Amino acid sequence: MFQPNFASVEWRVVSLALLLSLPNTAQADPLDKEISNLLQQRFSIAVLLSDTDAIAFGIGDFDPNALFDTANPEFGTDESINERRSKSVYVLPYTTNFDIEGSEDLHELSFKAFTIQTENDLKLFGTSKDLLKERTYGASIGYGYLYKASENVTLSTRTTTHLMRYENSFSTDNKLSSIIGRILDGRAVNVSAWAAIVQPSIKAKYTSPTSWGKWHASSTLNSFIGHSCGSANNGNIGNPKGWYLSNEITGYYNIYHGEQALFTGIKRVDLSHDLSDELGSPHYYEASIGWLFYAPKPFDWLDNFGIGVNFNYGSTLRGGSIQLYYNKQ
């Protein structure tokens, strides 16, 4: 028997179908708003998930409770690990700095390409196989200015523009689910949409060299706003907007005469409404530990590379993952 969970993706799909089946005058406004919010959130969450400084996805996911012999659901659950594994997030970022003649300040250019793919096994009716595949593709370019406020403090501002495409497809082996799919077809499922998003950010960073290496603390506020278009929901897609605040501290311990370093860090990320709806919490924490190699350098553009482990705590994506790093700052 179908047991409705009013906070679940499954129930949102069913409720959309029920609204669509009502007479036009009864369903138009609430349905348009619900689908519009759903599509808007897909672009909003893509801004966060493609920011490797805010959230980490790796080459393998695991439950930290199994590693530490604990039973804390905030570290991870079967559901949250499956949620992580249902998402394939690939981000290729590159950042380069340019000196300003006669100044310690720097110009910064950043480029990024990314793709986010999610497979939602909805099971709308008991054992039915109802698969919603979602894909978001994007490219970004940003300009930043880094101001050397003192020997230890750097203040920076950056503006990034994103161009994104979202699409989804729905398939099922169940007759009732197929009815829902036909009702929502072209409105909420089997649709595509585009968004152009502008993302300004400001950052303050304190760096302290030590006898054993260095440590730094930083605070970064990101906001974003955009415009969406496309055929989904008759063009009523909603415009993504939101913000997130990241505070972190990281330490680096030099080994092998500074050619390698061990690092550990922790961060807290606070989220705006749309993002917190997607991640199930107004904030989450991430902790990381790893090993970086500064030499040998196979490419001039590669400052360092390494491997580590990251832990997400407190969100629907809580759990552990194995990380590969390059040009980590």
Across the structure, where does each feature detected by a protein language model lie?
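Residue-level detector of the transmembrane beta-barrel scaffold of outer-membrane proteins
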Residues: 49, 56-67, 101-112, 154-158, ...
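Outer membrane beta-barrel transmembrane domains
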Residues: 229-329
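Outer-membrane pore/translocation modules
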Residues: 33-40, 94-246, 266-272, 279-282
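Generic detector of solvent-exposed, compositionally biased contiguous segments
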Residues: 70-93, 278-294
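Surface-exposed strand-loop-strand hairpins of Gram-negative outer-membrane beta-barrel proteins
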Residues: 56-88, 117-134
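Cleavable N-terminal export/targeting peptides
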Residues: 1-74, 101-105
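Subset of outer-membrane beta-barrel
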Residues: 36, 81-88, 92-101, 296-298, ...
